[in-house]
């Protein structure tokens, strides 16, 4: 195997093994390469691993849905600049392990309904937390079950959204692992 191909293989391994992601700076230091070269390799590896955007496999069976907010903190607003707003992300995780996460403009029932329609089969059963925006959004699906986090209910039989919450936590930790902050 050539040294450049070996570097790509090692780069891919480091990216995949880093639970909280890995920055191009860190991999460049570890491999003794230039950061722009590693950055380019990382993007090529990600592109090769990406699902075909034309193939939109819909999530089916039991699908967990949740939202999270990603972005800067108010303490990062300086010199009278507006406070940065966090970006809403809707996460959908099928119990078979497939998932979709999309940045949305707002978290309301219309936006969530459109997201569900695009990525989830109508025969799916949707599990959510007690968010008020979900009941209207999931109408037309096979079923809808909720867990009430306000009442400290996190699991009720097979009803939970732990997969979504775990994904959201990993998403935020990966931002911290590679970039330390988003502002």
Q: What residues fall within each predicted segment?
A:
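Residue-level recognition of single "structural anchor" positions
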Residues: 1-183
